[in-house]
Amino acid sequence: MTAIEQGCIDIWIDEIVPCLKDTVTGDIKETVVFKIESRTYLKKFQKSNGWHINWNEIPKNVEVYALALKDDNTIQGLVGVRNDKDSHAAYLHWACTAPHNNKHEFGNQKYVGVGGHLFAIAADQSIEWGYEGAIHGFAANEELLRHYIDVFHAEYLGMLHQYQFFIDEEQAKNLLEVYHYEWNET
């Protein structure tokens, strides 16, 4: 199984903010979430232009959602989520901030709060699928696993992957109380 097929979460949670915050002005920006249905549209988000993976190559059973600014629909991050019926949870397949928000790879960022929003979107989908917010995924490394345990009170599972984590229903509800966005059903 390739890394794209398996999925992996390599995103830092920088600041817990209800909406996105501009790092220069401190302005708070409202956000919207929309599902990306077209694999052709996903070709815009490639590893070669800073999106960590080629998003059009993820498995077809993974739903992709975009977090965008409400005022101009500029995409700030993407999250891939799969309905994992066997685990009774949403599987957080991939999550990636836009290159202009990734200070770990590009040295600076336009907005803080993107990473937490992407986790909240996965929790939202879990509720939609009847799992009360439960989500699990594979952290990219031990440092990120510890980060998710510290920030989200995730639990270490390590059954399917050495850095597998689980966010239970209670912690997912806490996420959804903090992060605010609107759904854009286009």
Segments (PLM) and residue ranges:
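Non-catalytic substrate-recognition and accessory regions of acyl/acetyltransferase enzymes
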Residues: 1-109, 117, 124-136, 143, ...
